[in-house]
Structures are given as C-alpha cells and as structure tokens.
From Swiss-Prot:
Belongs to the cytidylate kinase family. Type 1 subfamily. Transmembrane segments: none annotated. It is found in: Cytoplasm. This is Cytidylate kinase.
Amino acid sequence: MKKNIQIAIDGPAGAGKSTIAKIVAEALDFTYIDTGAMYRAVTYKAMQQNIHLDDEAKLAEMLAASTIDLKPSPQGQLVFLDGHNVSADIRSNEVTSSVSQVAAHAKVRELLVAQQQKLAANGGVVMDGRDIATHVLKNAELKIFMSATVEERARRRFIDNQKRGIDSSLEKLQEEIALRDKKDSEREASPLIQAEDAIFLDTTALSIDDAAQAILKLAEEKML
C-alpha cells in the first residue's frame, strides 16, 4: 500500500478548498499545507511595511528576509510570520482583496513555491491553492480541481465572515470573488487553470462532508 501520496487541490476563492483539505488531511493523518495562507502572510507584511503591492522586487526582497511557518493546533492550522501568530490578521477584508495582486508576481511565487515543494517532498500531504497540480506538485498522485458557482462561494464567504465577526456585504463579496477569479485566471505567472489530469469536483450542491468523502474515496484508490 502506497501511503505517502501527495494530494493537490486547486480551485477559485470560496470553493471550500481549505475546509475540505483539512478534513481529508486529518482523516488520512496527512500534513495539511495552506498555500493561500502563505500568500496572505506576504500581503499582510507588505501592507504593514507600506510596500507597494506592484513593486515585485521589493516584495521578493521582503519575502526572502521573512519566515512563514504553518503549525497545526487544536483550533486548526496557525500561521506564524517572523515568529508572530498572524492567523487572524491575514483573513481581513483588506488582505483578502489584495492577495491576488501579490500572488501575480513571478518572483514572489518562485520563492513560495520552493518552500511549498520542500514541505511536500516526503509525501503524506494535502496541499491546496491555485496552481498546485499545474505547477507546485506536478507529479501529485491525486489532483482535484474544486469549484462552485460565484453566488454559492460568496454565500459561504459571507457566513465565514459573520462567524469571524467581519462585516461584509453579500453583493460586494460576489463582485470581489468574480474579480478575483478574473485576476487569478488571467495572470501570467501560474494562472488558475485545471490540470489535464485533475478530477473536477463541483461543490455547489455538496455538503463539506460529502465533498471530503468523495476525495477520500479517490485517495484510497490511489493508495492501493
């Protein structure tokens, strides 16, 4: 039985990737790697240091001098930036609306991809993001492309924000998600596209548990 496989999950904002990836990782006793949190951490630090988000060279220089650690905890994965817990800070509306701008820079992606590949080198990982199957883990044994309608993804984000105590408008969230889809799919550096060998999973009408079970079934087949 091949145990330490790599599972790559890609998809647009609000598709449920992180929530479902965490459940899959826990069920398989795998490590979960949230690549989106890494890009959010870079965005947050740049904003804190007043670095212009279009300044690729400065962003790359800042990132090269930074440490981003992902640590499991009973409350879920915690994100540490230069030793400080920024798990809540990186989920702000300001960071959410700016992260695609930072992620579009090839030098930033290059540095983070190297870190992500190192984390996944020994397998036994579930990694989610925008370009995992197409770029970061091209040889992953299981590749999933997860999506849902813009309306459903906005509804989920709205509920998440309410739980976190973040004020948001459902209509504005729909606009932001549609814009982020456009930015992510049209960027030059590793655009959001489905890998040829990825399995498409539409989560619009699926519960979180149903989607996780579908992936677990596929994972078990790959591990035989």
